[in-house]
């Protein structure tokens, strides 16, 4: 079993492990967000966009046996981690309390609640069939969209965000190959990414919006 096979399906995701995972992720992100010189770099991106959090959710989803278990554990992970991110930044003096409360109640609070139904759906990514492949592809599309937005920033200010670009696109390939074992299902996942991304770009074009 490779490292990635172990990570996506070979771990014992107990409740204590979920809580410790959430604490570790929250503290790390909070520290990265508190170091001002890191703001234009990939190390700070975990505090701004979702790429790492998608990966964390996939790790939990692929190591749960049932959908309800996945939903609850994903919810608890974000319930623990996100307030910690803001708490660390407030204590470090890089974020004022009222802004932290606003960001959490406006963004991550509602997003955390959505992980309950989201976790039920995300649990399907481990299924070795077309449905699992499609759900995985839709999740991977979030990584692709984030990666494309950072490509634009990378072109504008090289080499900032290079590691995040590599993480996004490399993560899609690694997770697809590690989670879906059959070639035909991997093809379905990659095809889903293409279709979903093209559809998103068409919607943005039709509404006069841009990706970045």
Language-model regions, residue ranges each:
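Membrane-interface helix caps and helix-loop-helix hairpins in membrane proteins
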Residues: 38-40, 150-159, 208-210
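Structural signature of hydrophobic alpha-helical transmembrane segments
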Residues: 41-52, 100-111, 157-168
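Hydrophobic cores of alpha-helical transmembrane segments in multi-pass inner/ER membrane proteins
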Residues: 52-62, 110-123, 167-175
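Central hydrophobic cores of alpha-helical transmembrane segments
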Residues: 72-83, 135-143, 185-199
